[in-house]
Amino acid sequence: MKRNTKQLTLYTTRGSLIAAMYVLLTLLSSVMGLSSGIIQFRFSEALCILPIFMPEAIPGLFIGCLISNLLANGVFWDVIFGSLATLIGALGAYYLRSLPENLKWLATLPTVLANMIIVPFVLIFAYGAPDSYFFIALTVGIGEIVCAGFGGSGLYYLMKKTFSQYLK
């Protein structure tokens, strides 16, 4: 029983730290004017690669996104569906964790795709964005490719090299 309690404490702590990092990085993006609107560069999306290393990143990312959207005064649909897009991306990364080493970067694709598909609907229907769905999907996709794709891949290789002994 002691081992299970210790393991649960470790998972809860890691998940909470990931949620806090997500909020902090989103706030940093927001201060720079990059985290909302048609063109979004949320630095926090790079963290969506973390489920490859630890399953507790999944609730951490979801809760972090939920808190970030609440702090940004997002409308109800943005808070719900934006957070669900992050949850879908995190689950996708987790299920792609067994990819060969040279293909690990593909684990960032669920985050990119979930946001490209869901966020344009949120921007159009919740905020009344005047642009077409496909244009918004393109602009959101560019931000996701930069932050989740390149940022997440960079974070993966940095963690793999630097922290591998702690990630078992």
Can you describe what each PLM-predicted range is?
Residues K2-P59:
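Hydrophobic transmembrane alpha-helices
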Residues L27-I38, L66-F81, A85-L91, Y95-K168:
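Membrane-embedded alpha-helical hairpins and interfacial helices in multi-pass inner-membrane proteins
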